[in-house]
């Protein structure tokens, strides 16, 4: 493992560290995110059943008009508010796990997470 670890890029190393922490035996629902240059995706996953419970992205009909040229703070606000709306309809009572993947916890990723936290969801 040590030899393999030396040949990985920084984002791949970060992703491995995060996966190791997420798979530490905690049975919680996971919010996974993915971002590209133009779009932002988030989904709530039940890892025990292997099912996506809900998802939201900048390609949704409600948000698509706001996201014309790429992702920015306004689109993240729209995506997070839509995710909060969908999660509150599900009436979750347990803590969630925030899976940021290989992304650093800065910028749009932290803004999305803080919006969820401010609405009462716990990671």
Swiss-Prot record:
Entries under InterPro entries matching the protein: Ribosomal_uL18_bac-type, Ribosomal_uL18_bac/euk
Matching CDD domains: Ribosomal_L18_L5e
Gene3D superfamilies: 3.30.420.100
Leader peptide range in chain numbering: none
Biological process, per Gene Ontology: translation
Single GO term (MF): 5S rRNA binding
GO CC annotations on file: cytosolic large ribosomal subunit
Entry keyword annotation includes Hydrolase: no
Pfam families with a match to the protein in the record: Ribosomal_L18p
Family: Belongs to the universal ribosomal protein uL18 family.
Quaternary structure, from the entry: Part of the 50S ribosomal subunit; part of the 5S rRNA/L5/L18/L25 subcomplex. Contacts the 5S and 23S rRNAs.
Annotated function: This is one of the proteins that bind and probably mediate the attachment of the 5S RNA into the large ribosomal subunit, where it forms part of the central protuberance.
Name of protein: Large ribosomal subunit protein uL18
Native organism taxonomy: Bacteria, Pseudomonadati, Pseudomonadota, Alphaproteobacteria, Rickettsiales
